[in-house]
Amino acid sequence: MDSEKVIKRDNEYVLHTYNRNPIALAKGHGLYAEGPEGQKYLDFTSGIGVNSLGYCDLTWAEAVSEQAHKLQHTSNLYYTAPCGKLAKKLCKRTGMSKVFFGNSGAEANEGAIKAARKYSFDHYGKGRDVVITLVNSFHGRTIATLTATGQEVFHNYFGPFNEGFVYTTAGDIEGLRELVDRHTCAIMLELIQGEGGVMALDPEYVQAVRALCDEKDLVLIVDEVQTGVGRTGTFLCCEHYNLKPDIVTLAKGLGGGLPIGAVLLNEKTAEGMGPGSHGSTFGGNPVVCAGANVVVDRMDQSFLANVSERAVQLRAGLAKLPMVKNLSGIGLMVGIEFFGGIQAADVLAACREKGLLVLTAKSRLRLLPPLTLTAHDVEKALGILNEVLTEMEQKAPKEQA
């Protein structure tokens, strides 16, 4: 089926909740996606940070296929080997005690909120249930995680929202301290605000938040849905901050392309979550976990060193491009701000026409390439971006540059 028919059918029958790019994708290999007519795209989006190993990694695909031919689903009424293997690997890699598996980042964050409130209820009783999150945060699109999201643009139309969430500005530790009262149970944050513009938090602020949580016995939840599993050059972004959260959430890159969410809990937050406290029919699915096991196994020291090296190469190249004002993020989670009237959406469209797929986040261009990229892949992407930005620079008024 050609692209036009694929797009037409989708527009006719799929709910229009996405502002899709006007292209269809049919298959992929490595860092390249291919359309029905054979047009190729160098993909620096990874399906929004999901395809950690690129498209159709052979070892990953074989593991998923092999498990699908053995046992595709059981529910959590029974034990399966892939689920337990993955949980053990995650605990050993992160120092956490237990893992709960769901199907998405939003579901993982819901589970984290529940676990934090359960800990507080068990130790302090009813009424200590407020979670503090950051302005410009993004934690999901369910009602609870949408309420946790500190961006008013996401709060239109869907009220009434859940009680129990308040917001503070990143970096303002005194403002945060003033918000904490006898009703507060947790502080929840992203170390890099992905949908908020790819903005990394200040390390001193993060350590001050940890200290405040220790002082007040608050649960510190770190949302690593987008930053986790090698994206920043370490298995968790927490490692860059020398941070030990009480709960960490993972999703996107963990499954390598299949839907998964994970709540990683330390001993104190795990102990109260007994049978019936939470659940997910599809959580810990053996096929998905088989793929995730391959992803986690791949994240050895050599692999992560290459991620860091490619990030240095990419950022150094981006800094030399015309119209680039500054860069944000950590590792291979990159935000690009432009001078003057250059719009990230226009850069995205122009890159797509030249065969490079990229993302936006607020006013910035966002790059989330597969973690398997090579030096050649980086240079090719930089070449396309250079072409696009040079053309835009020539058209822009001189004072904008």
Q: What do these predicted ranges mean?
A:
Residues 1-401:
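Conserved N-terminal phosphate-binding loop of PLP-dependent enzymes in the Aspartate aminotransferase
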